Regions:
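Conserved RNP beta-strands of RNA recognition motif
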Residues: 72
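Catalytic core of pol beta-like nucleotidyltransferases
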Residues: 1-48, 52-68, 76-159
Length: 159
């Protein structure tokens, strides 16, 4: 997984930072008034950019009216936090209608346990994200034993 998004132009980097801040703020508002600790104390563990912007082959074609979107995998600490009710406002706020965010944004949300399970099962979609994606925001959390095996480490050697 890439640790830098330096291949993106400065304007795209700034826009992506704004997207991340917007997503985080909307999520914090969505969990703020919850009573259950697992929801009230819910956390975004990682936000990973994948797809064309992560690979560096995005399209910006005003003539053909085609524009690549930011594909973001959001990893949360509890399965219940993947429910759409927590992300509706984040999606609304990241629509490309204002001067701060002009690129379409596509969010998918999975719990860490689910992502690790998908990686352990060798699901291509998740394996591609780990291989090609770039971490936009992260807490100190590791993904799957499958990633460790790919890198020649035993799970007990995780940092």
């Amino acid at each position: 997984m890439k640790k830098s998004l330096d291949h993106l132009p400065p304007r795209k980097q700034a826009e992506l930072r704004q997207v991340v801040e917007t997503v985080r703020a909307a999520f914090e508002e969505a969990v703020f008034s919850r009573r259950a600790d697992r929801l009230k104390n819910g956390k975004i563990l990682k936000i990973i950019l994948y797809g064309s912007y992560a690979r560096g082959d995005w399209v910006h074609d005003p003539v053909g009216r085609y524009f690549s979107d930011y594909d973001l995998l959001i990893i949360v600490d509890h399965e219940d936090l993947t429910d759409y009710e927590f992300w509706r406002e984040a999606e609304n706020r990241t629509m490309p209608v204002g001067p701060d965010i002009r690129t379409p944004v596509s969010l998918i949300v999975h719990a860490l346990d689910d992502v690790n399970d998908q990686l352990d099962r060798g699901r291509y979609f998740f394996a591609d994200i780990v291989r090609e994606g770039g971490v936009v925001a992260a807490a100190l959390v590791r993904l799957s034993r499958a990633v460790d095996k790919e890198r020649g480490r035993e799970p007990s050697q995780r940092q």
